[in-house]
């Protein structure tokens, strides 16, 4: 997984948020992506820990730890490090049908649970996830899937979480 010495060689890097006054004039992302080389370095920081708590999605002493939808984070970090973006998307879609939504609203408990976070700064998992799905849309790997036929039926959706978005 990743580069065995990646967590030693590379520091945690996160994109710099756009200034609020700059964001007022448009609907563009306020968390821009790192360039590909730097994203791959962040993927290399994933250290193939023995027990990757980042994707456990467990409650420990009543507190959430790791990814609540059990994304296989070390695997797609490794694929990004190796430049295998399409495969990283496939791995991400194994557990998450809506990374373009959930990845943006998630508070990233995976980063808090990252084993590297014990003695150093955690891997920038959230920024890697954003880059995977945004690249997938840009490359045409993800396309809208409208219903094949209209049934004429109506559905009431309660809530705006992942289940509501899937309805």
Locate each region found by the language model:
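N-terminal Rossmann-like FAD-binding beta1-loop-alpha1 element of flavoenzymes
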Residues: 153-167
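Ferredoxin-type iron-sulfur electron-transfer modules and their immediate structural context
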Residues: 1-154
